[in-house]
């Protein structure tokens, strides 16, 4: 599950205020030493005020997913959908020290720039200094992990291979097609 988080760090962060869910999509990185998730959010995001005092949160990470046609199988099957998801629950505490927030932003940038590291966010970056007053840093202590991996694993070996190839092919093609249409 950690590999899903590292490979697909854009998370869906869910908090609840007055029985109303607040949902934000933002990158979170996994800290190998603490086992916590680290992130930051725009201070004016309504969810920011809930990211403190050990408030409960739910986090969802999404890996590749696609429709699987029965036509790819060597055996008779029904249409299905394959996907990889990781559901986490935890408690969040705020990071209030501006240097600690900067360090978390630098650490996140280092992680996201892998493997080439074409950009380095320097601690004295004036844009970061200007933005730091508008960002709330936070850390999530994960209390519950749940992997949701539906990958045709109940099929025959060749059908599993075919489903894997379809998942790879469909994701590559759908990304290219979608971005061509909207970007």
Which residues make up each language-model segment?
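Hydrophobic, proline/glycine-rich low-complexity stretches
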Residues: 1-6
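Short beta-strand segments
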Residues: 8-43
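A generic structural signal for short beta-strands and their flanking turns/coil linkers
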Residues: 9, 24, 35-37, 53-57, ...
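An N-terminal domain-start capping segment
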Residues: 36-57, 165-174, 180-183
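Short, structured beta-strand-loop surface elements
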Residues: 44-104
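C-terminal edge-of-domain segments
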Residues: 95-183
């Amino acid at each position: 599950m950690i590999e899903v988080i590292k490979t697909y760090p854009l998370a869906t962060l869910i908090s609840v205020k007055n029985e109303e869910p607040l949902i934000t999509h933002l990158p979170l990185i996994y800290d190998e030493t603490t086992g916590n998730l680290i992130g930051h959010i725009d201070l004016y995001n309504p969810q920011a005020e809930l990211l403190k005092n050990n408030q409960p949160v739910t986090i969802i990470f999404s890996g590749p997913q696609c429709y699987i046609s029965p036509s790819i199988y060597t055996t008779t099957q029904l249409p299905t959908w394959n996907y990889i998801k990781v559901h986490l629950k935890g408690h969040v505490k705020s990071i209030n020290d501006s240097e600690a927030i900067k360090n978390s932003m630098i650490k996140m940038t280092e992680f996201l720039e892998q493997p080439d590291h074409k950009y380095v966010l320097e601690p004295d970056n004036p844009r970061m200094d200007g933005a730091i007053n508008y960002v709330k840093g936070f850390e999530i202590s994960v209390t519950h992990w749940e992997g949701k991996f539906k990958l045709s694993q109940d099929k025959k070996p060749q059908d599993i291979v075919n489903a894997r190839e379809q998942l790879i092919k469909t994701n590559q093609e759908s990304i290219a097609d979608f971005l061509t249409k909207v970007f």
